[in-house]
Amino acid sequence: MNQERVFKVLLGPHVSEKATVLADSKKQFVFKVATDATKLEIKKAVESLFDVKVAAVNTLNVQGKTKRTARGLGKRNDWKKAYIALQPGQDLDFSGSAE
């Protein structure tokens, strides 16, 4: 997988209360990913970007909410979320600080 596709697959971490609990307790991390990304692409992107070993990838499609606007009803975009489980002894560091 080329470097350009790696950055297009992973859109960023998804920060929520549930994601924080999973990261602390089970070493599972949640990312927003491209809607056309496959589990294998997501696994390779995380492994190459963060230098960790991925044990499992679970994905789900999140439906966009319907919202009221001044002109009637509108709909937010659908998006895809990936739960990344790391192998034992691995950890992700989002701060990017070199020690």
From Swiss-Prot:
One of the early assembly proteins it binds 23S rRNA. One of the proteins that surrounds the polypeptide exit tunnel on the outside of the ribosome. Forms the main docking site for trigger factor binding to the ribosome. Pfam families: Ribosomal_L23 (PF00276). InterPro entries: Nucleotide-bd_a/b_plait_sf, Ribosomal_uL23-like, Ribosomal_uL23/eL15/eS24_sf. Part of the 50S ribosomal subunit. Contacts protein L29, and trigger factor when it is bound to the ribosome. It comes from Stutzerimonas stutzeri (strain A1501). GO terms for molecular function: rRNA binding; structural constituent of ribosome. GO terms for cellular component: ribonucleoprotein complex; ribosome. GO terms for biological process: translation. HAMAP family: Ribosomal_uL23_B. This is Large ribosomal subunit protein uL23. It comes from the Bacteria. Belongs to the universal ribosomal protein uL23 family. Keywords: Ribonucleoprotein, Ribosomal protein, RNA-binding, rRNA-binding.
